[in-house]
């Protein structure tokens, strides 16, 4: 509701400071060394007060309040998460999307909160390097249609093709939830579905 989220630990704070995100406030444990060149308000807090604010059991003595970014234009390579509920999974997929240089990640259908502290930690800083947004399914479909980006799903059906045979020069690839896979609503909008061929012994 505030339009802000909390990140914890020196690495995440430094990633936030180096990014295009606006860092509203830095919270630091009394006696801790501060990063150089801070221009935003900095509050020194007793260790027990900072620990109460943070999500981790053993905070690293520094945290930051960061403003969420407004949505930018859609890129050519998009990952869609459809109902992925575990914050660690959402964060890991965002980190993987960053490793593959994807343009953005869109979350639909009650995914884990993008700005949950567990999600943010699992991204290992990728949340500050990749565009990532929670949107409604209708908003996603509208964005893809306006941008001319086809939607592909990771599921098995009659038109499923091996990943290596798909033209992904311009594409959004949807990944379903841990328990049920892709929702029918998203599956119905997929131009094709993709599979990764596996060794029969697997």
Could you tell me what each predicted segment is?
Residues 18, 70, 74-159:
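RNA substrate-binding interface of SAM-dependent RNA methyltransferases
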Residues 57-62, 66-73:
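Acidic/glycine-rich phosphate/pyrophosphate-binding loops and surrounding catalytic core
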Residues 33-40, 71-74, 184-188:
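Short loop/helix-cap segments at secondary-structure boundaries that form the rim of catalytic
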Residues 45-46, 82, 108-109, 131, ...:
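Short beta->alpha connector loops at strand-helix junctions that form conserved
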Residues 10, 28-34, 68-69, 156-158, ...:
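Short, polar loop motifs at secondary-structure junctions
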Residues 152-202:
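Active-site/ligand-binding-proximal alpha/beta "capping" segment
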Residues 1-55:
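N-terminal positively charged helical leader segments and presequences
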């Amino acid at each position: 509701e505030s339009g802000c989220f909390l990140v914890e630990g020196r690495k995440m704070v430094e990633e936030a400071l180096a990014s295009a995100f606006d860092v509203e406030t830095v919270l630091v444990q009394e006696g801790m060394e501060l990063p150089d060149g801070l221009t935003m308000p900095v509050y020194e807090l007793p260790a027990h007060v900072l620990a109460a604010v943070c999500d981790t059991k053993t905070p690293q003595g520094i945290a930051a309040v960061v403003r969420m970014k407004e949505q930018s234009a859609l890129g050519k390579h998009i990952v869609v998460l459809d109902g992925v509920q575990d914050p660690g999974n959402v964060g890991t997929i965002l980190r993987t999307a960053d490793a593959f240089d994807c343009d953005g990640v869109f979350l639909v259908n009650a995914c884990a909160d993008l700005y949950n502290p567990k999600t943010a930690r699992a991204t290992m800083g990728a949340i500050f390097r990749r565009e990532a947004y929670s949107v409604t399914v209708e908003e996603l479909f509208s964005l893809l249609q306006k941008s001319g980006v086809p939607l592909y799903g990771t599921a098995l059906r009659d038109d499923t093709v091996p990943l290596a045979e798909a033209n992904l020069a311009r594409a959004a690839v949807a990944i379903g939830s841990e328990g049920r896979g892709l929702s029918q609503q998203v599956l119905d909008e997929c131009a094709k579905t993709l599979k990764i061929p596996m060794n029969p012994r697997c």
